[in-house]
């Protein structure tokens, strides 16, 4: 099967003519609809791109706002913790100061009680000594002394004991 040059040119002209006729028919009947579909699709793609850009900007703003809120929350939490530590330190210092004051008060009371006990003991010893001195003096003198003489004797004896 061999094709001649004339047949080849004829087929070429026929196919080319058919394509041209087909393009003319498409342009006349379908090109408006195809162009309309392509333009509608182009507009839809543009709207989708614009919406995507707006969504991205909105998400970026929301992220910035959320980050600012998070930073503010962290700052507040840090301040609350700092304030709690400071209050705890102040309360601890107050408790230590109160305990120190209470210890000083108890120490002073104990010293006062000791001084009072010492004074009471010395007074009791003096009384006992005076009674013993009177008894001893009565035995030595063989007679009872009147109250004035007893008092003078006791005072002089105690003064001698105090100096010794």
Swiss-Prot record:
Keyword Glycoprotein: no
Claim: Transit peptide is one of the keywords in the record: no
GO MF terms, alphabetically ordered: proton-transporting ATP synthase activity, rotational mechanism; proton-transporting ATPase activity, rotational mechanism
UniProt xrefs under SUPFAM superfamilies: F1F0 ATP synthase subunit B, membrane domain
Superkingdom of this protein's organism: Bacteria
Keyword annotations: ATP synthesis, Cell membrane, CF(0), Hydrogen ion transport, Ion transport, Membrane, Transmembrane, Transmembrane helix, Transport
Membrane topology summary: Single-pass membrane protein
A Pfam short name: ATP-synt_B
Chief place of localization: membrane
GO cellular component terms attached to this protein's record: plasma membrane; proton-transporting ATP synthase complex
Segments traversing the membrane: 6-26
Subcellular location: Cell membrane
Subunit structure as annotated in this protein's UniProt entry: F-type ATPases have 2 components, F(1) - the catalytic core - and F(0) - the membrane proton channel. F(1) has five subunits: alpha(3), beta(3), gamma(1), delta(1), epsilon(1). F(0) has three main subunits: a(1), b(2) and c(10-14). The alpha and beta chains form an alternating ring which encloses part of the gamma chain. F(1) is attached to F(0) by a central stalk formed by the gamma and epsilon chains, while a peripheral stalk is formed by the delta and b chains.
Role played: F(1)F(0) ATP synthase produces ATP from ADP in the presence of a proton or sodium gradient. F-type ATPases consist of two structural domains, F(1) containing the extramembraneous catalytic core and F(0) containing the membrane proton channel, linked together by a central stalk and a peripheral stalk. During catalysis, ATP synthesis in the catalytic domain of F(1) is coupled via a rotary mechanism of the central stalk subunits to proton translocation. Component of the F(0) channel, it forms part of the peripheral stalk, linking F(1) to F(0).
Family: Belongs to the ATPase B chain family.
Descriptive protein name: ATP synthase subunit b
Lineage, highest ranks first: Bacteria, Bacillati, Bacillota, Bacilli, Lactobacillales
């Amino acid at each position: 099967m061999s094709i001649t040059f004339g047949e080849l040119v004829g087929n070429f002209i026929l196919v080319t003519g058919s394509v041209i006729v087909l393009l003319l028919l498409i342009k006349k009947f379908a090109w408006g609809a195809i162009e309309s579909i392509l333009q509608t699709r182009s507009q839809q793609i543009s709207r989708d791109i614009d919406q995507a850009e707006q969504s991205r900007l909105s998400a970026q703003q929301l992220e910035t706002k959320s980050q600012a809120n998070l930073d503010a929350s962290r700052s507040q939490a840090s301040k609350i913790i700092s304030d709690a530590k400071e209050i705890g330190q102040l309360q601890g210092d107050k408790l230590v100061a109160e305990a120190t004051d209470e210890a000083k008060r108890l120490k002073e009371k104990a010293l006062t009680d000791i001084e009072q006990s010492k004074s009471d003991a010395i007074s009791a010893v003096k009384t006992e000594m005076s009674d013993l001195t009177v008894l001893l003096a009565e035995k030595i003198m063989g007679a009872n002394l009147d109250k004035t003489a007893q008092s003078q004797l006791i005072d002089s004896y105690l003064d001698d004991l105090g100096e010794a």
